[in-house]
From Swiss-Prot:
PROSITE patterns membership: SERPIN (PS00284)
Organism expressing this protein natively: Xenopus tropicalis (Western clawed frog)
Gene: serpinb5
One GO MF term attached to the UniProt entry: serine-type endopeptidase inhibitor activity
Protein name: Serpin B5
PANTHER family: SERINE PROTEASE INHIBITOR, SERPIN, SERPIN B5
Keyword Ion transport (UniProt): no
Known role: May not exhibit serine protease inhibitory activity.
Glycan-carrying positions: 133, 176, 361
């Protein structure tokens, strides 16, 4: 399980860095776990160089049994998801004309429950698209209206890899709504935009990355199954968001070190954090190709002989939608009234761009990650 956690973390950092490269100043949220789970299922059906490319991108070099690892992880997370308002949908849709081997179907059921689905793209592409959209809408409680746009499926569609992730958790400690006030958020050294800033004083885990002058705060959600980790540079020191150095320096090893509980201390913290809601859609094909997954997208080169006898099969589309909402809701008030309010307190003022990670604490798995650079026009 630990080897799989490390592999999933390494892919999550790769994905994060690709999203940062794409744009220096955009807000984003993404679920690397949806991607790694679906890719692992697709890897299970592949052979030869197709399998090698997938295993390399997934960092599976030291993972002895990824299927069993995903089985335990899915089971752990699904048990606590509904109580924590987490919706994770991972699907690999395969066209009916591709006859999947019985062994493949049966062996995928436990590690990737409900993730493999057959559907009729060949003769009813538009109906298939509508059916997929309805299914995603229903399974995410209406969070996502349209995942596949009109014309995105046709009679040549073979495999669609699709992920949808949404989260709106309740913190352990409630932010007092009456203390939420409009404040300036520094988008860069020169510009500000108004945000609704929430305030809280509580005992929380906090760490510091000295070489990057960056604070790491852990904010637990109810029942402490999930936490949000927030990486906040002390100040904006570059000509952009202030995150450039942190984004460039982040590696899988460094992230693991920075967020290790032994690197953090329990302290009284005065937190100021913007309220926000963020949603993104991704066509993942180019990103996955840039991570070295090429054959799986190329029907001339792909080898899915563990899945089917059919030839000329490739992934037609890889799509993800993700959304996250952060507000004051919590389950208990932080009782700091007994301690004098301003004694020896760390201040965590998130009034400039930061990186955030939604983590499953038992396995330290990254469920979602993102970057907040300021209020979007819509919010």
């Amino acid at each position: 399980m630990d080897a799989l956690r490390l592999a999933n973390t390494a892919l999550a950092v790769d994905i994060f860095k690709k999203l940062c490269e794409k744009s220096a100043t955009d807000n984003f949220v993404c679920s690397p776990l949806c991607i790694s789970s679906s890719l692992s299922l697709i890897r299970k059906g592949s052979q030869g160089n197709t399998a090698s490319e997938l295993e390399k991108a997934l960092h599976f070099e030291k993972v002895k049994d990824p299927d069993f690892g995903f089985q335990l992880l899915s089971s752990d997370i699904s048990k606590i998801s509904s109580a924590n308002s987490l919706k994770l949908l991972k699907r690999v849709y395969v066209d009916n004309s591709i006859e999947c081997k019985k062994d493949f179907i049966n062996s995928a059921k436990k590690p990737y429950p409900l993730e493999l689905e057959t559907i009729d793209f060949k003769s009813q592409a538009e109906e298939a698209r509508t059916q997929i959209n309805s299914s995603v809408k229903e399974l995410t409680d209406g969070n996502f209206e349209t995942v596949l746009n009109e014309g995105s499926c046709d009679e040549n569609t073979k495999i669609i890899m699709l992920g949808a992730a949404s989260f709106k958790g309740k913190w352990v400690y409630t932010f007092n709504k009456s203390e939420t006030k409009e404040m300036d958020f520094h988008i860069n050294k020169k510009e500000t935009k108004p945000v609704q800033m929430m305030h809280l004083e509580a005992r929380l885990s906090i760490g510091y990355i000295n070489e990057l002058k960056t604070m790491v705060l852990e904010m637990p959600f109810q029942s402490k199954h999930f936490s949000m980790l927030i990486l906040l540079p002390k100040d904006i020191e570059d000509d952009s968001t202030g995150l450039k150095k942190l984004e460039q320096d982040m590696t899988f090893e460094k992230y693991t070190h920075w967020t290790n509980p032994s690197m953090m201390a329990n302290s009284k913290v005065k937190v100021s954090l913007p309220k926000f809601k963020m949603e993104n859609s991704y066509d993942l094909k180019d990103m996955l190709k840039s991570l070295g997954i090429n054959d799986a997208f190329n029907e001339e080169a792909s080898d899915f002989s563990e899945m089917t006898e059919s030839k000329g099969i490739s992934i037609s589309q890889a799509i993800q939608k993700a959304c996250i909402e952060v507000d004051e809701d919590g389950t208990e008030s932080a009782d700091v009234s007994m301690e004098r309010r301003l004694m020896n307190k760390e201040e965590f003022l998130a009034d400039h761009p930061f990186i955030y990670i939604l983590r499953h604490n038992k396995t330290r798995t990254i469920i979602m990650l993102g970057r907040y650079c300021g209020p979007s026009e819509a919010s």
